[in-house]
Amino acid sequence: MADTSDFKNGLVLKIDGQLQQIVEFQHVKPGKGPAFVRTKLKNVVSGKIVDKTFNAGVKVETATVDRRDMTYLYHDGSDYVFMDGETFDQISISEATIGSSARFLLENMAVQVAMHEGAPLYVELPVSVELEVTHTDIGLQGDRSTGGTKPATLETGAEVQVPLFINTGDKLRIDSRDGSYLGRVNA
C-alpha cells in the first residue's frame, strides 16, 4: 500500500483489478477545501491513459513490478524473443505488449522488461538508439516546402523524418519513445 505522498512517475498501482502506471501527477492544495492529487494513469495492458483524482492521504494498493535486464534476440512471427541476462532463459513477448517501440528493436539490443507475477507487462528500450539509414532520397538544398526534413528508412525497417543532409549509410541517434531524430553518430 502506498500513500498519495509516495506517488512518483513510473509507480504501478492496482486500481479496480487493473495495473495502472503513473505517467504524471500533481499535488493540489486549493484555497478552500481539502488537498488532492491529480494524476494521469496509463493502463499497463491496453496503454490507455486516463485522468484520476485522489484525496490527499488516501492509501492505494501498489503492484510489485520486477524490471529485468534482457537482450533482444530475434523476431518470430508476431512475437519477439528476449533472453534474460542472469538466468539465460528465453521468453517470447507479443508485438501488442511491446507496442510502437518494436520498430526500433535491433538484434542483441539491451532492454529492460517489466514483469508482474511472471508475465511481461512492457519493454523499455534505451531512450536513444543508434541505427543506420538503409534508404533515403537525396534532399535538395532549395526544397523547403517540407520544413527541411525528408523520410528515411532505418535498418530495422522503421521510417523516420530526418534533416535534408542525411544520406544512405549514415548512422543516426533516434529517440525510441517518439521516433524523432536526435543527431548523427560520429564514425
UniProtKB/Swiss-Prot annotation:
Pathway: Protein biosynthesis; polypeptide chain elongation. SMART domains: EFP, Elong-fact-P_C. Its main location: cytoplasm. GO terms for molecular function: translation elongation factor activity. The keyword 4Fe-4S does not apply. GO terms for cellular component: cytoplasm. Keywords: Cytoplasm, Elongation factor, Protein biosynthesis. It holds the Pfam family Elong-fact-P_C. Belongs to the elongation factor P family. Involved in peptide bond synthesis. Stimulates efficient translation and peptide-bond synthesis on native or reconstituted 70S ribosomes in vitro. Probably functions indirectly by altering the affinity of the ribosome for aminoacyl-tRNA, thus increasing their reactivity as acceptors for peptidyl transferase. This is Elongation factor P. It comes from Nocardia farcinica (strain IFM 10152). The gene is efp.
